Amino acid sequence: MKNFTSLLKLSLIAAFFVSCSGDELTNADLYQEEVPQKIADYIGSDSDYTMFNDAILGSDIQDWLAHQEDITLFAPTNVAFENYLSQNGMTSINQIPQDELAQLLKNHVIQSEILISDLNTVEELFVETMAQTSFESSSHIMSIISNHDGLKINGGVPVITPDMLFDNGVVHSVDQIVELSTARTFINECLEFSRFKALIEESADASTAFTTLETKFKSGLSQELTVFVPANGAVDAFKSALNAGDTNNNIAQSINFAVSTQLSFQENYEVSELSDGLVISTLGSDVSTSLTSSNEISFSTGPFSEVVKFRSQDLTSIQTSNGILLLTDKVLF
């Protein structure tokens, strides 16, 4: 019993000295919360993203990325960069012009948080990236996340590791570079544009049209596009009207003319730039823009043509890297 009492006294003395020393553990030490990690810190410390981190540093967007909040980042792995460089005849990220590299990286960033787990029942989602066009307007470029046959970005990039949460947003790992969308990206991938895509395929100049729609814009080397994209129902109605009274030869000519009239290489006409009396030259005909009494924008190819309007006031256009899609309720003809 004496031994136990002695041990108890020694324990109390030891506890007293520990509590009075400067090295004691406080409640704050024991229950200290882990500081949430920023996306930029994660990218900079993970060996799977060394090339992505080098690209961020090389394009001078490090500070920009560090100050973004509530973002979605599709983070390309080293494999993604290696394949991209190989496909473009390069061996180093330094071979990509700095301004192009900055926009390519910003194309992986969306200014809102999107969880892949929330997209199980979503067929298509149009999202605005932080990349901008190289046109005078410098509008933000959109991407399409489709879930028709497995979730993909811009028609070809699957997500490898989804929904990694950080203090300033969410990261989804991808093993392919998400390239800037073109007009063809959306025409290929959007189900609501499938009839228009089929109409182009029926035209005599389908190959040229598709090549133009997917050509990357380079200032001085290619033209900005404005593409009038009719809804599926509008294309069906147009073809039904043709089949009702025309010969096969006339139908083919009408389809060629219709496709040409939806394509303009004149300028990237944003909705805010459309004004009463504006004439847009297309490959098929001049398209006149008018304002109705209720300030609705309408289009026509002549005094006896049908009046064409936007199919919805909620989504009137889609901006891509090489041009803009204006979403209409009828085929311009």
Please provide the spans of the model-predicted regions:
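Short domain-boundary/entry signatures in modular proteins, especially
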Residues: 37, 174-190
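Surface-exposed patches in mature extracellular/periplasmic domains of secreted proteins
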Residues: 60-68, 92-95, 207-219, 246-248
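Bacterial N-terminal signal peptides that target proteins for export
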Residues: 1-8
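Short active-site loop/helix that positions an aromatic residue
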Residues: 80-94, 233-248
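Post-signal-peptide N-terminal segment of Sec-exported extracytoplasmic proteins
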Residues: 40-82
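Aromatic/histidine-rich interaction motifs
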Residues: 86, 91-157, 248-313
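FKBP-type peptidyl-prolyl cis-trans isomerase
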Residues: 74-84, 162-180, 228-234, 315-333
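Bacterial Sec-dependent N-terminal signal peptides
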Residues: 10, 16-44, 325, 333
